[in-house]
Regions:
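Basic/polar phosphate-binding segments, predominantly the helix-turn-helix DNA-binding elements
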Residues: 178, 183-220, 239-268
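C-terminal regulatory/oligomerization modules of transcriptional regulators
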Residues: 148, 272-275
Length: 275
């Protein structure tokens, strides 16, 4: 695959995005709304995540949890190639429930990088099962491999339980942004929503999300823009509808964070090849 290419593949299971990629791009700090797990096929990269700075080389498993702030850069000019599956939390939740025997409703990947040949082999089999159509026994193979892979790589026994999560005070400030990221918001607004001082809001945001309030707002706007684009909204409308000044503003943020333009992402969302 040529460097700089992101190739989406048709996926048999709803709520799963399969991508084969090759890139020399240095990704800025960003988050995903999905769980991501993949294998580096060529080259190597360094990345900072909520679980520390790591390096991944060919054959390694790479993972990311929803909302986890991370970046990524190749270790040399040759770049790196990888395959990755992104899972909506609704896909992962029942697997975690089964693996934990009902103890957890959602888990998280334990490590951002794993050097585990067995898990890598299982992932590649799962990637093939997810992208090879709907044979008579495809669902059984797919579901079995998914459960095996997540049982090996995800902590489902100490996952999030009811009543756990973000402290209630800052949760109100997060909700102020999450409810409609397109609406302008000030630090004063967030302080009033949470009942905290502006400085307390800054510290609490960093503890809860790893981002400043402004960076969190921009990320949530990008998340909203991605959903609008995936639903077929014109790019200019998606930009305005998600709170950006215009399409060029959205495009600059998109490229910095994800290494591809909104129009390229639209192609991925509709299953078209990126060339």
């Amino acid at each position: 695959m040529p460097a700089g290419q992101f190739q989406p593949l048709p996926c048999a299971l709803p709520g799963v995005l399969a991508v084969q990629a090759s890139s020399r791009h240095r990704f800025a700090r960003h988050t995903h709304e999905q769980f991501g797990i993949g294998v580096v096929e060529r080259g190597a990269q360094r990345s900072a995540s909520g679980r520390g700075e790591v390096q991944a080389v060919a054959g390694d498993i790479i993972t990311v949890n929803p909302g986890e702030v991370h970046d990524g850069m190749p270790l040399d000019e040759a770049g790196r190639s990888w395959r990755i599956l992104y899972f909506d939390p609704e896909v992962v939740a029942p697997v975690c429930h089964d693996v934990s025997e009902g103890a957890a409703r959602l888990g998280e990947f334990r490590l951002p990088v794993l050097s585990d040949r067995t898990s890598a082999a299982v992932f590649l089999q799962l990637f093939d099962a997810m992208t090879s159509g709907n044979a008579a026994d495809a669902a059984l193979r797919r579901d079995s491999l998914l459960m095996l892979l997540l049982a090996r790589t995800m902590d489902c026994r100490h996952g999030l339980r009811e009543g756990e999560g973000t402290p209630s005070a800052i949760a109100h400030a997060l909700a102020r942004i999450d409810d409609d990221p397109s609406v302008p918001v000030s630090l004063d607004d967030l302080a009033k929503a949470s009942g905290l001082s502006r400085f307390q809001v800054l510290r609490a945001f960093n503890r809860a999300t790893g981002l400043t309030p402004h960076a969190y707002l921009v990320q949530r706007r990008i998340d909203l823009a991605r959903r609008l684009i995936a639903c077929g909204r014109p790019l200019a409308d998606a930009a305005i509808g998600s709170g950006f000044a215009d399409q060029s503003h959205m495009t600059r943020i998109f490229v910095r964070k994800y290494g591809l333009s909104p129009s390229a992402y639209a192609a991925i969302a509709t299953g078209r090849s990126l060339r």
